[in-house]
Curated annotation (Swiss-Prot):
This is DNA-binding and peroxide stress resistance protein YaaA. GO terms for cellular component: cytosol. Keywords: Cytoplasm, DNA-binding, Virulence. One of its GO terms (molecular function) is DNA binding. It is found in: Cytoplasm. Belongs to the UPF0246 family. Protects bacteria from neutrophil-related defense upon infection of mammals. Binds DNA. GO terms for biological process: response to hydroperoxide. Its main location: cytoplasm. A motif (Helix-hairpin-helix) lies at residues 35-66. It comes from the Bacteria. Disulfide bonds: none annotated.
Amino acid sequence: MLILISPAKTLDYQSPLATTRYTQPELLEYSQQLIGIARKLSAPQIGKLMSISDKLADLNATRFHDWHPDFTPQNARQAILAFKGDVYTGLQAETLTEDDFDFAQQHLRMLSGLYGVLRPLDLMQPYRLEMGIRLENPRGKDLYQFWGDTITEKLNQALRDQGDDIVINLASDEYFKSVKTPKLQGQLIKPVFLDEKNGKFKVISFYAKKARGLMSRYIIENRLTQPEQLKAFNSEGYFFDADASEKGELVFKRHEQ
């Protein structure tokens, strides 16, 4: 079972580390190409491209300039501990055990605009480069064209290494679009999280993102290997709704809090 999640814009390079173990990202030669392109952009150009404030544009121009491919624990941090968005609030990686990290390293992958595919313990230097950004490059007009089949090939390798063909898609549409599904050698399962509001169940972005992290943690902590086992997920009040689910899509609902 291979879990896919999105990265986060919010980063944490200060908190105590839950593990000192680390690995190196496997697609750094691609990252270097993107950094080379990004370094040619001025801060105002970065601001316009990413629709961010002047302050954030300056920060990310500095990050691109400071980035270099010699990753050490002194200048980088394990990806699963560096990302700090809603998904990672649900995942709570800072409380995982060493055995949990072992399982996650084999069964969890983070999709990334700059790094392509990250394993949990892969070191990464801080960046902001969302997958949906239209950054022109030698392979095309955006990052989807830049990455081409590379991300899919890396995921196929991970599927072979971990021994089955089940892919749990907990990534956002923006990031999952970087995966060429016809070429993915796996059976796709997409959990969907619906929260009740005014008597109706619907996707509420903040809750859905956190739930993706909760589900990731549930799989890791319980060492799940079969899709059927996902149906028992009940963190923070969610329950499986068989009637609303269909092939390839598992629907979980939660009553109004």
